């Protein structure tokens, strides 16, 4: 390389380093971008709501992961009064601010929790420039829209931004709710965002935007001055309509779980062993009985192929069943899988098998379907449920499979365990 080219390369490198130093200094001057996730332990509509799972993950962990996925967010904080939420949040990578009881009741506002978190952070020496306020009860936070909003506020193009989706809906209200003093029928329907006498086509209308509650981004200084999240130049961060669900009741939780199964790619389950129940997992939980009292069950050949693939990969498997019927052992022998059946205490049996195999419980997946599986599900790192499992099992599961027992659920689990 010529001396001129060397000098040019050195100059370019020096200028790049100077630019990076200047950018870092500017960021220091502006203060950090902090994501704050309020997540109290109490909830009336959905008990322990922030710890309920969607897509196999507690809601508060989903929010933490969404924030961590945004490169421009420097610090992720969970404000909580609850020990379990705090532990889950720390494990997910968040810093925890303990919220006092006075700010943890049903009437406490999100703003009060955010102000308290800012005070705690600043007393610890942090300088905050921009706040991203995320709600754990919104399980689908679009990280691309969140990242764009953080940039827009950080670059000074907006003071406050909210997640919202486009809507062309015709909104109506009741007369008494709109104007209690008006001389109209209190139950009369009143057009809100349109002229009731004119019905334009969708393509001829301008859209409105419905706030989703998933996230808000704003300048910290402006928030302190205003005392609320909307001030100055307010802009919309547009998000897909399907992400707008916010969980306030059990039905919304079920819908969110269904949406997660539709829209999210299943993650690999990195375990060293697979343990399954038999009835309701390898079978559809039904049986036929002949005149001699002999029970027969239906099993899935697809599951059988999955078990053979797991065996070839050298990953241990065990069938652990309460059932004493000889069909359990017959199927296990056919699959060439060890079996413990006629077991009433599944937890103790599983602990003993894991100890003998030298495999930590945290690295075992247990696949179950009914309440007698709960003790085993609670001690493993990966509690898994078939799609049609008992509600208590679905709630205990880290992952809920898409397939039902006896219809490929075992194969589905194995395909998520095997690498590649």
Model-assigned labels for residue ranges:
Residues 77, 83-132, 140, 148, ...:
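Short phosphate-binding loop-to-helix
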Residues 5-30, 177-189:
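Intrinsically disordered, low-complexity terminal tails and inter-domain linkers enriched
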Residues 110-112, 116, 138-239:
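Conserved core of the sugar-phosphate nucleotidyltransferase
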Residues 21-22, 219-221, 241-276:
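Non-catalytic pre-domain segments flanking phosphatase-related domains
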Residues 269-286, 410:
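Asp-based phosphoryl-transfer active-site loop
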Residues 9-12, 26-47, 276-279:
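N-terminal nucleotide-binding beta1-loop-alpha1 segment
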Residues 32-79, 297, 303:
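N-terminal glycine-rich phosphate-binding loop and ensuing alpha1 helix
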Residues 289-300, 306, 325-327, 334-340, ...:
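Mg2+-dependent phosphoryl-transfer enzymes with acidic/Ser/Thr/Gly-rich catalytic loops
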């Amino acid at each position: 390389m010529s001396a001129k080219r060397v000098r040019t390369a050195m100059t370019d490198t020096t200028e790049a380093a100077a630019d990076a130093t200047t950018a870092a200094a500017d960021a220091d001057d502006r203060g950090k971008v902090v994501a704050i996730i309020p997540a109290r332990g109490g909830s009336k509509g959905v008990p322990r709501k922030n710890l309920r799972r969607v897509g196999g993950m507690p809601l508060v962990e989903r929010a933490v992961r969404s924030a961590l996925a945004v490169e421009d967010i420097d610090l992720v904080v969970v404000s909580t009064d609850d020990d379990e939420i705090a532990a889950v949040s720390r494990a997910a990578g968040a810093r925890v601010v303990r919220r006092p009881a006075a700010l943890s009741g049903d009437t406490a506002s999100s703003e009060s929790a955010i102000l308290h978190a800012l005070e705690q952070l600043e007393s610890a020496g942090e300088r905050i420039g921009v706040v991203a306020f995320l709600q754990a009860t919104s399980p689908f936070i679009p990280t691309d829209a969140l990242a764009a909003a953080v940039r827009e506020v950080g670059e000074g193009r907006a003071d406050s931004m909210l997640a919202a989706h486009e809507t062309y809906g015709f909104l109506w209200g009741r007369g008494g709710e709109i104007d209690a003093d008006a001389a109209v029928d209190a139950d009369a329907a009143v057009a809100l965002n349109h002229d009731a006498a004119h019905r334009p086509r969708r393509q001829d209308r301008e859209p409105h935007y419905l706030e989703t509650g998933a996230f808000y981004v704003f300048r910290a200084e402006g928030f302190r001055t205003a005392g609320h999240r909307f001030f100055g130049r307010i802009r919309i961060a547009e998000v897909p309509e399907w992400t707008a669900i916010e969980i306030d009741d059990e039905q919304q939780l079920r819908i969110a779980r269904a949406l997660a199964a539709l829209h999210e790619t299943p993650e690999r389950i990195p375990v060293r062993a697979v343990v399954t129940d038999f009835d309701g997992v390898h079978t559809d939980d039904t049986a036929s009985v002949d005149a001699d009292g002999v029970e027969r069950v239906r099993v899935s050949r697809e599951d059988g192929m999955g078990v053979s693939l797991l065996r070839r990969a050298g990953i241990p498997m065990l069938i652990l069943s309460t059932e004493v019927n000889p069909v359990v052992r017959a199927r296990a022998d056919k699959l060439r899988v060890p079996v413990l059946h006629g077991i009433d205490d599944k937890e103790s049996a599983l602990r003993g098998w894991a100890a003998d195999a030298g495999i930590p419980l945290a690295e075992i997946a247990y696949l179950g379907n009914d309440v007698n599986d709960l003790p085993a599900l609670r001690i493993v790192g990966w509690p898994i449920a078939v799609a049609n499992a008992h509600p208590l099992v679905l709630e205990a599961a880290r992952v809920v499979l898409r397939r039902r027992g006896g219809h490929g659920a075992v194969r589905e689990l194995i395909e998520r365990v095997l690498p590649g």
